[in-house]
């Protein structure tokens, strides 16, 4: 790290080695040639009030967007047992998978808006789509209406919120970017605790329609605060849209490997996220207790998104991420697969909540590490879009496996574990490319 290199050589190799060009004049030069490239205006050693307010805003934005998405398992169970009880698990699963797809797949658009206009424009548009979609969901009675409102409209809104909420605060924290990113992402865990409790208790008292409206009003308040407080430490210059900016990073082997890691990780992760509640009810857990699994999962996930950031700072992001992926695979196959009693299911929920939180929190930080600062927005969007393809397909595939196995969840669990195994293998290859075979090398 301390050796001196020619700036051009360093710039050309920076993406492959996971480092950033070190000179501000070099960044400024790149910004004139890259499309919608934000330019770093300063590198403060001490963060002021503006930085901390932006971090708080990012936390609230993730609370209202990804935090809401974290309670999809409740709606999978609710729809299968009530509103859409005439539909199969696979058909109901499309509501969640389409939501995941738009949440992740629209990220290139969100990244483009963020790079060109800053965090507030995509957050304002995303707030409208997210709140409007939930309001329309409160009126939905047919299958296609749930797809259009909760999956498409609200999904687009969450995507437009997540990218700037997660990215903008990190521009202030150059020395602790991973930790700052972990703090903002942890907002989704807290949202994943509050919203399930809120939905669970309101459904029985005020009904489905007003439950959705109450959640939408809370999200609206949080998003107004987020819009007011958030900012970034870069200058955003809108320029002509060029599709190649999103496709060019895929030519880089390291970035392509990271996209494959994301695809298979989300392929495996969203199966327990979607089917955890309904599978626990299937194996004898009460509906009330089954619904409470989601806030338990997300409560533990909060620590999973924060604590590993400190480990990553000491041992390396990639190293800690690989360990979390291996743990996820083992927990899926060794705990969720054989779990039939309430105690075993709760133990799985606690374990998976922590390790899944770690992978969700560390994954975007790896993308930040191997991307130059002036390309973070659309590179992050591209990686999320690829992950969205995995999120789109895994719940319906798992649903077909469940239906084909007489309603049992064994094959779906195996599918999830194998997807994690493939993702881990690809991540090991990426780690070796970045830091070599040394087990003690910090990567």
From Swiss-Prot:
Protein name according to UniProt: MFS-type transporter opdK
Keywords: Glycoprotein, Membrane, Transmembrane, Transmembrane helix, Transport
Start-end of Polar residues biased regions: 27-43
Membrane topology annotation: Multi-pass membrane protein
GO-annotated cellular components: membrane
UniProt record similarity statement: Belongs to the major facilitator superfamily. Monocarboxylate porter (TC 2.A.1.13) family.
Residue ranges, annotated region (Disordered): 1-43
Transmembrane stretches, start-end: 55-75, 91-111, 121-141, 146-166, 179-199, 214-234, 255-275, 284-304, 317-337, 343-363, 382-402, 410-430
Highest rank taxon of the organism: Eukaryota
Glycosylation sites: 30
Organismal lineage: Eukaryota, Fungi, Dikarya, Ascomycota, Pezizomycotina
Subcellular localization(s) per the UniProt record: Membrane
Organism: Penicillium oxalicum (strain 114-2 / CGMCC 5302) (Penicillium decumbens)
This protein's record includes keyword Transmembrane helix: yes
């Amino acid at each position: 790290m301390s050796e001196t290199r020619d700036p051009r050589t360093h710039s050309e190799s920076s993406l492959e080695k996971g480092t950033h060009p070190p000179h501000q004049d070099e960044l400024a030069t790149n910004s004139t040639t890259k499309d919608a490239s934000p330019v770093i205006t300063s590198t403060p050693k001490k963060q002021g009030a503006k930085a901390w307010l932006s971090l708080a805003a990012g936390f609230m934005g993730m609370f209202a967007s990804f935090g809401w998405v974290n309670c999809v398992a409740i709606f999978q169970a609710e729809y299968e047992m009530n509103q859409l009880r005439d539909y199969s698990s696979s058909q109901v699963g499309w509501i969640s998978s389409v939501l995941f797809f738009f949440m992740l797949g629209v990220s290139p658009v969100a990244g483009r808006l963020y790079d060109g206009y800053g965090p507030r424009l995509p957050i304002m548009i995303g707030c409208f789509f997210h709140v409007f979609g939930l309001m329309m969901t409160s009126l939905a009675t047919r299958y296609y209406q749930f797809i259009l409102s909760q999956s498409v409209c609200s999904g687009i809104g969450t995507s437009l919120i997540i990218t700037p909420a997660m990215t903008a605060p990190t521009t202030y924290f150059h020395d602790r970017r991973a930790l700052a990113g972990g703090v903002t992402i942890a907002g989704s865990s807290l949202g994943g605790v509050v919203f399930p409790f809120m939905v669970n208790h309101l459904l029985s008292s005020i009904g489905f329609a007003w439950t959705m409206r109450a959640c939408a009003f809370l999200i609206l308040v949080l998003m107004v605060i987020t819009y007011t407080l958030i900012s970034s430490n870069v200058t955003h210059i809108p320029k002509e849209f060029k599709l190649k900016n999103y496709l060019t990073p895929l030519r880089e082997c390291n970035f392509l490997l990271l996209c494959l890691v994301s695809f298979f990780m989300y392929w495996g992760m969203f199966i327990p996220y979607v089917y955890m509640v309904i599978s626990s009810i299937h194996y004898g857990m009460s509906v009330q207790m089954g619904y409470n699994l989601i806030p338990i999962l997300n409560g533990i996930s909060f620590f999973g998104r924060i604590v590993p950031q400190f480990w990553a700072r000491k041992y390396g992001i990639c190293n800690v991420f690989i360990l979390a992926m291996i743990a996820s695979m083992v927990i899926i196959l060794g705990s969720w697969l054989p779990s039939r009693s309430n105690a075993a299911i709760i133990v799985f929920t606690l374990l998976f909540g922590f390790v899944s939180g770690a992978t969700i929190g560390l994954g975007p930080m790896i993308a930040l590490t191997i991307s130059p600062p002036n390309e973070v927005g659309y590179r992050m969007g591209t990686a999320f879009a690829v992950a969205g393809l995995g999120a789109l397909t895994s719940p319906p595939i798992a649903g077909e496996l469940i239906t084909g196995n007489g309603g049992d969840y064994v094959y779906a669990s195996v599918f999830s574990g194998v997807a994690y195994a493939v993702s881990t293998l690809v991540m090991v290859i990426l780690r070796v490319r970045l830091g070599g075979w040394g087990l003690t090398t910090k990567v």
